[in-house]
A protein has these predicted regions:
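A structural motif shared across PLP-dependent enzymes of the aminotransferase-like
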Residues: 96-109
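Glycine-rich cofactor phosphate-binding loops and adjacent beta1-alpha1 units
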Residues: 188, 192-236
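Mid-domain Rossmann-like dinucleotide-binding core that forms the NAD(H)/NADP(H) cofactor-binding site
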Residues: 87, 122-199
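A glycine-/small-residue-rich N-terminal strand-loop-strand element
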Residues: 52, 73-97
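Residue-level recognition of short, solvent-exposed, well-ordered loop/turn junctions
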Residues: 31, 87-88, 108, 143, ...
């Protein structure tokens, strides 16, 4: 019998640390159509975890004790009757609410997405990579040769959008909040990095990119959003 350890929300409140505890129990074997996965890495989303503890996630009601974590990557260790794929030993990614912050998870076989290898970089591409691709290509209709501005450009979503926009052959303006992030963004090809602690994004855009931003991807909102709108190119 396999022993499982999982992080559980045992009460609601503002602090994830105070509202959660580690619980240990045995892990059941997979039933028909299920797979048992040994999680190796879990994606961490601090904002989502905080909202879970406050029961403020719109699509999920939290009633303690509640399971935690969403995306995870690991190895299929056992399969139930009727499972054709994935097979034991296969590397898989899952995106199931409450099944990531634990050693072992049981899930329907169709929820386990085969991937080439178990690596944190692969896991990061599932939520952030897909979101970035949809935002840029499907919503923003990204092409090439455009001026693209990305806020929170070194964050989980922003860093992927920045690299995709650079790879597509665009002039990329990356906004971030410290020197280390600025250096990293420059290293991956951002053409103009704005550290908002040293420079005013509004002033930079007014002097260098007035009415010339073709596509702006904003993860901050508020006054920043207004500044970006003010400097969009015609039809931007």
């Amino acid at each position: 019998m396999r022993e499982n350890e999982r992080i559980v929300i045992h009460r609601l409140g503002e602090s994830f640390r105070d509202c959660t505890q580690i619980r240990r129990d045995s892990c059941a074997e997979p039933g028909p159509g299920e797979v048992l996965i040994r999680n190796h890495f879990a994606g961490v989303n601090g904002v989502y975890d905080q909202m879970m503890c406050l029961d403020k996630v719109e699509h999920t009601r939290v009633t303690p004790p509640a399971e935690t974590g969403v995306e995870a990557i690991g190895i299929v260790e056992a399969v139930g009757d009727g499972v054709v794929s994935p097979n034991p030993g296969q590397s898989v990614v899952t995106v199931n609410v409450g099944q990531a912050y634990r050693y072992w998870q049981l899930c329907p076989a169709e929820d386990a997405i085969p991937v080439p290898q178990v690596a944190p970089e692969v896991l990061a591409l599932i939520p952030s990579g897909v979101s970035a691709l949809v935002a840029l290509e499907q919503v923003g209709e990204l092409t090439t040769g455009e001026t693209v501005l990305i806020t929170a450009a070194a964050g989980g979503l922003g860093n992927v959008m920045t690299q995709l926009a650079v790879a597509a052959g665009n002039h990329v303006i990356a906004v971030c909040g410290n020197a280390d992030k600025a250096a990293w963004l420059a290293s991956v090809g951002a053409d103009r990095v704005i550290n908002y602690r040293n420079e005013s994004p509004g002033a930079v855009l007014a002097s260098e990119y007035a009415d010339s931003i073709d596509l702006a991807m904003d993860s901050v909102g508020g006054d920043v959003f207004d500044v970006l709108v003010d400097h969009l190119a015609p039809r931007g």
